[in-house]
A protein has these predicted regions:
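Conserved alpha/beta-hydrolase catalytic His-Asp/Glu region
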Residues: 163-234
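Catalytic histidine-centered segment of alpha/beta-hydrolase-like enzymes
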Residues: 252, 276-286
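Short beta-strand/loop motif that positions the catalytic acidic residue
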Residues: 238, 244-246
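Alpha/beta-hydrolase fold catalytic core
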Residues: 1-37, 56-60, 85-99, 293, ...
């Protein structure tokens, strides 16, 4: 993984005011379809290092760290869903004159859906990997429900976050993988090391716990009450091609939610990966990449063409004169 040009060699703040401070250029041909990967709650660009090399033979892949996540400090910016959707939009405008394909996992899938609804011209297509979808309480795993409730109680959520952050980074990563994966041992050792490195760097940031608490409350408010119906309306307004990938063993967003979304949006392509949890791009990168590349050649072909810089140049009006 290489650092994108918005990152100074000394690791200082990014050079683009109002845009993400840290992002990764994961490779791929300059003329290939642009895929921008959007991580989930508490995640980072590292969430994509396993699957990206399997896509960069034909696609250009970038992955930003959203505000309050990864190595992008909030610095007074909001870390909730709406704020990071706006941040993503500015990032897209800064890296490409034309539309991109957004690939979002969990909260990143939600933010990608909202961006496609708010700015359809900026999004050629969506690849949703176990996205945060509208949920009813009965659909949730009891343990997951209990954790979410804790974060909604004033003071308790921050205390839980503070306790987690006192653990060594390796233990934090292991705990997240146990929750998010059906079989954590499937995640490659070098990928785990990269996540530990990011958390070790993030441990030096001030306000990281408050940033996470604000983000998780925002996600819960969007998928549940009071925002669920508004979120559903935004989802139904999305007109671009959509690939919905979902692990059948996901405890955070059950596969029944994905099946419901696919029924309600018949133009979407649903691909279930059996026996995999909430992060297929980490737990089953080969299967995930196979589904993505197949979609890009078939139902997502128009999205791939629209996201390719060469096509964007052809579509741009000729200069007068």
């Amino acid at each position: 993984m290489t650092a994108g040009p918005a990152i100074r060699p000394d690791g200082g703040p990014g050079t683009q005011p109002g845009v993400v401070s840290r992002w990764a250029d994961l490779g791929g041909p300059a003329g290939g379809p642009l895929i921008v990967c959007v991580h989930g709650l508490g995640g980072s660009a590292a969430n994509w290092v396993a699957v990206a090399p399997l896509l960069t033979g034909s696609c250009r892949v970038l992955a930003p760290d959203l505000a309050g996540h990864g190595l992008t400090q909030s610095r007074g910016r909001g870390t909730g869903v709406a704020a990071n959707r706006a941040l993503l939009h500015r990032f897209l405008a800064s890296v490409s004159p034309g539309p991109a394909i957004l690939m979002g996992n969990s909260m990143g899938g939600m933010i990608s859906l909202l961006e496609a609804s708010a700015h359809p011209g900026a999004v050629a297509g969506l690849i949703l990997v176990d996205p945060a979808l509208p949920l009813l309480p009965a659909q949730l795993d009891p343990l997951v429900t209990a954790v979410f409730v804790l974060y909604l109680i004033p003071g308790i959520g921050r205390a839980v976050t503070a306790r987690q952050r006192r653990q060594p980074p390796a233990r934090q990563v292991a705990g997240v993988l146990r929750l998010c994966c059906a079989e954590p041992s499937r995640v490659a050792a070098d990928v785990i090391t990269r996540h530990v490195q990011v958390l070790a760097q993030r441990a030096r940031f001030t306000g990281a716990g408050q940033d996470f608490s604000a983000a998780i409350r925002s996600v819960i408010a969007t998928v549940g009450c009071p925002g669920r119906r508004a979120y559903q309306r935004r989802i139904h307004s999305v007109a671009c091609p959509v690939l919905l990938i979902h692990g059948t063993g996901d405890r955070l967003v059950p596969v029944t939610a994905a099946r419901t979304a696919a029924r309600q949006n018949p133009g979407w392509t649903l691909a279930e990966i059996t026996g995999v949890g909430h992060v297929p791009q980490l737990e089953a990168p080969v299967s995930t990449a196979r589904v993505i590349t197949g979609w890009l050649r078939a139902a997502g072909r128009t999205a791939a063409e629209a996201a390719a810089p060469g096509r964007q140049e052809q579509a741009r009006p000729a200069a007068a004169g």
